[in-house]
Amino acid sequence: MNKKIKTEAVDSLFDAILSLESREECYSFFEDLCTVNELLSLSQRFEVAAMLKCGKTYLEIAEKTGASTATISRVNRSLNYGNDGYELVFDRMGK
């Protein structure tokens, strides 16, 4: 865990997210919290991670998602050398 982000404010945000009970509640909360572009960027990174996990090439990912190679590379680095957060979520989602 990155100690730079471990703050009371971040803990409070994560507690708020964990309190959400449905996809509709997530839409309501995240539409209030994030700009459209911020939310689309987060979802793009998640899609990139899923495609990398499935063995897709950078070219295939860039064509489907519109992500830059820099974004794809950053996500790939997180998948390979990060805190296993993507893996945890993918396992729970059955991906």
Residue positions per predicted region:
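Short, amphipathic alpha-helical "recognition" segments used to contact nucleic acids or chromatin
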Residues: 42-56
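Short, Lys/Arg-enriched anionic-surface-contact patches
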Residues: 25-44, 94
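Major-groove recognition helix of helix-turn-helix-like DNA-binding domains
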Residues: 48, 72-79
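General nucleic-acid-binding
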Residues: 1-20
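Short alpha-helical "recognition helix" segments of helix-turn-helix
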Residues: 60-65, 72
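General marker for long, soluble alpha-helical cores
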Residues: 59, 87, 92-95
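Short, solvent-exposed alpha-helical "recognition" segments
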Residues: 77-90
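Residues at alpha-helix boundaries and the short loops/turns that link adjacent helices
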Residues: 20-24, 36, 55
